[in-house]
Amino acid sequence: MAAPKNDNVKQRILDAAIKLFQERHDVSLAEIAKAANVSKGTLFYHYRSKAEIYLDIGEQYWNKLSDDLLAWVDNAEKDTSIPRLVRYTFIRGVFDESGVLRLRLFVEAISGEEGVVIKARLNDQYARFKNILKDRIVERMPGADGEQLAWLLLALVDGLMVQNTLQNESIDINAFIEWMAANFSDFQ
């Protein structure tokens, strides 16, 4: 039997880490190695810290979100008007199963040993996604301040993701999303 490809091993490690991180925060590298069915040495070869694992998880999340958004918004057969773009961005960002993991990534960025590295990568990922949103907003709302509107969307998505993760029943997130979709053009 051939040895597994590095990409497969790395993905197995990430999949195991995601599952464990969704259950709790205090997961050791040894637990991740065991869950991924790899040796500690193999895990260390790919990841020297939990922070590196969190970063790759975050990178996968942002890449998937970006790729999905681009595939949707660039599909000429779809209605990708501003209300639909806003609704799509909120639904994908707020209700995605990665909410708990994203919050843990924020915690690592703020208080983890490698916080500076995580902050830099997170900021790069936010800037990349902001630029995608900005370009799509300006295409649909010529003359609008796409930069600020994209940041507004991202800040609101993160805030609603926190409220959704906390299961805050005092806010009707779906109603808020519909209100934003209907009124977003007024913010230009």
Regions found by a protein language model. Name each.
Residues 12, 16-23, 68-72, 101, ...:
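Solvent-exposed, amphipathic alpha-helical segments
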Residues 29, 54, 82, 99-103, ...:
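A general structural signal for well-ordered alpha-helical segments in protein cores
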Residues 54-64:
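Alpha-helical DNA-contacting segments of helix-turn-helix folds
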Residues 56, 70-96, 139, 149-153:
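Hydrophobic alpha-helical connector segments
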Residues 94-120:
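Amphipathic alpha-helical segments used for helix-helix packing
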Residues 116-124, 138-188:
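Hydrophobic/aromatic-rich alpha-helical bundle segments in the mid-to-C-terminal region
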